[in-house]
């Protein structure tokens, strides 16, 4: 493992969190050993006083590396990429790097917040199930349409070529959730669908899947 001899990293995670999912992929790609600490969001573990000391926002993921505590998935991934630079998660090519940042941003600000557990719970108090589903699906459809147009001319085996980069870490969990949680039809997004097929062939992505996490309900395994 890349962090052999160092204190083991600690990842506070929830099996179904797409934000934690993308960090698990990064850790797997880097070959890093870590302790998985489950935070059950449905039971409210994120509001526990001990966890709030680690992350005052009460969200996952949180990464603890010795005295360093990082609570945002993008910040965690960038921290890991700088501390453990192989394999790199950003391409040298400036244009491809910008595309990776754009894809990440679309997921981070345009799609994922609309299916965040806290947001969905709040919305459920205001509208019925059908309206909630339509609201979430609209955000996914809008985001996937933008991603398809962004990546159609630069994708290879993966989002921005034949190497795994930052965009792939954000796309894989989002597509997985869209298909398995929200039954999104991927036919209108052939580039994204092709990328997703490639992810399913990679051990680092397979091992990071929600249903393979230790806190996943047995019915999902």
Curated annotation (Swiss-Prot):
Location of the GST N-terminal domain: 7-88
CDD domains: GST_C_Zeta, GST_N_Zeta
InterPro entries: Glutathione-S-Trfase_C-like, Glutathione-S-Trfase_C_sf, Glutathione_S-Trfase, Glutathione_S-Trfase_N, GST_C, GST_Zeta, GST_Zeta_C, GST_Zeta_N
Cellular localization per UniProt: Cytoplasm, Cytosol
Record's keyword annotation contains Secreted: no
Keyword annotations of the record: Cytoplasm, Detoxification, Isomerase, Oxidoreductase, Peroxidase, Stress response, Transferase
EC number assigned by the record: 2.5.1.18, 5.2.1.-
Domain GST C-terminal per the UniProt entry, residue ranges: 93-218
Signal peptide feature range: none
Principal location listed in the UniProt entry: cytoplasm
Keyword match Oxidoreductase: yes
Induction pattern: By salicylic acid, methyl jasmonate, auxin, H(2)O(2), and the pathogen Hyaloperonospora parasitica.
GO biological process: aromatic amino acid metabolic process; homogentisate catabolic process; toxin catabolic process
Gene Ontology MF annotations: glutathione transferase activity; maleylacetoacetate isomerase activity; peroxidase activity
Pfam families: GST_C_3, GST_N_2
Reaction(s) the record says it catalyses: RX + glutathione = an S-substituted glutathione + a halide anion + H(+)
Coiled-coil positions: none
Binding site for glutathione: 17-22, 46-47, 59-60, 72-73, 112, 116-118
PROSITE patterns reported for this sequence: GST_CTER, GST_NTER
Cellular component terms per the entry's GO annotation: cytoplasm; cytosol
Family assignment from sequence similarity: Belongs to the GST superfamily. Zeta family.
Subunit organization: Homodimer.
Function, in words: Acts a maleylacetone isomerase. Also catalyzes the glutathione-dependent dehalogenation of dichloroacetic acid to glyoxylic acid. In vitro, possesses glutathione peroxidase activity toward cumene hydroperoxide and linoleic acid-13-hydroperoxide.
Protein name: Glutathione S-transferase Z1
Species this chain originates from: Arabidopsis thaliana
Lineage of source species: Eukaryota, Viridiplantae, Streptophyta, Embryophyta, Tracheophyta
